[in-house]
Amino acid sequence: MDIFREIASSMKGENVFISPASISSVLTILYYGANGSTAEQLSKYVEKEENMDKVSAQNISFKSINKVYGRYSAVFKDSFLRKIGDKFQTVDFTDCRTIDAINKCVDIFTEGKINPLLDEPLSPDTCLLAISAVYFKAKWLTPFEKEFTSDYPFYVSPTEMVDVSMMSMYGKAFNHASVKESFGNFSIIELPYVGDTSMMVILPDKIDGLESIEQNLTDTNFKKWCNSLEATFIDVHIPKFKVTGSYNLVDTLVKSGLTEVFGSTGDYSNMCNSDVSVDAMIHKTYIDVNEEYTEAAAATCALVSDCASTITNEFCVDHPFIYVIRHVDGKILFVGRYCSPTTNC
């Protein structure tokens, strides 16, 4: 959750949507080639591949792919290549067709939702490109009926509102909790998908109360809040929305503690025989939430260069909120903030 917190704090008033699963996969690839303090800092983000496989096996709506492209003239260490396995492929980064092929691979895998991943030609110094893409599409276990969707005011702030297409569902049982914390009060609800995933929605009691909740959104707190959920008959109202995101994560990750991972401070002596540095980490995302299903995709790439009770209540999402798509085992696939309907894609 720390990466989400950093991005959210630097993009006040904007929608945010990221995939921790995709980001962790790329950081894991970098970890395989890292040494010393660089490896130590990356180790907290190492993705256990069996966890990704578990999600993929138990929920056919979620799939992930990792690819590592290495410059054909570079000499990579056998220990690094063994860890990467069949994900590795040598390419000519100076050939414009290489970028086209990589973008096409991500485009096809994400069902056309991430295109292009790479907007500009790569530097001639590019030694390695690590890519992770994830795609998620799942139907609601209890779909919203389209006849109940209508225009409804969404309060961007206490004094400003815009109309949104609000989906509604009445008198259904969902896991729900009202949480009181020193930093603010809020409600949390679990909206399950068919299969082993669900969307958790965190809604502050106050229209302008989201920032303090974001600042305290840690993995520990999130697990605690989820453990407080109880089955409740409740009316649910949540906007239909689409959001896209594009981020260079270097500054965010440095602020999150990865101070010796990027630029000249990174030690990747377990990757190849020459001195290399990680100069960029690009993350692109897409999500579509509607009455029938949620569809989401994300792709991340790192450029390595030479040097989600019985009394009927109401849960009305009519002001900024946080949403998390997670697997039943607790793994967070996507996390986002929705606060600006006018910037839907």
Curated annotation (Swiss-Prot):
Cited PANTHER family: GH10112P-RELATED, SERINE PROTEASE INHIBITOR, SERPIN
- What is an example of a Pfam family matching this protein? Serpin
- Family matches, as SMART domains: SERPIN (SM00093)
This molecule's function is given as: Viral serpin that inhibits both cysteine and serine proteinases involved in the regulation of host inflammatory and apoptosis processes. Major anti-apoptotic protein which inhibits both intrinsic and extrinsic pathways and strongly cleaves host CASP1 and CASP8 but is a rather poor inhibitor of host CASP3. Prevents the proteolytic activity of host interleukin-1-beta converting enzyme (ICE) and ICE-like enzymes. Can also block apoptosis through host tumor necrosis factor (TNF) receptor.
Which positions does the site annotation Reactive bond cover?
A: D306, C307
| SUPFAM superfamilies in UniProt | Serpins
Any one GO CC term of this protein is: extracellular space
Cell compartments where the protein resides: Host cytoplasm
Full protein name: Serine proteinase inhibitor 2
A GO term for molecular function? serine-type endopeptidase inhibitor activity
Please provide the record's keywords in A-Z order. Answer: Early protein, Host cytoplasm, Host-virus interaction, Inhibition of host caspases by virus, Modulation of host cell apoptosis by virus, Protease inhibitor, Serine protease inhibitor
List GO BP terms, alphabetically: symbiont-mediated suppression of host apoptosis
Q: Does the keyword DNA repair apply?
A: no
Q: What induces it?
A: Expressed in the early phase of the viral replicative cycle.
Q: What family classification does the UniProt entry report for this protein?
A: Belongs to the serpin family. Poxviruses subfamily.
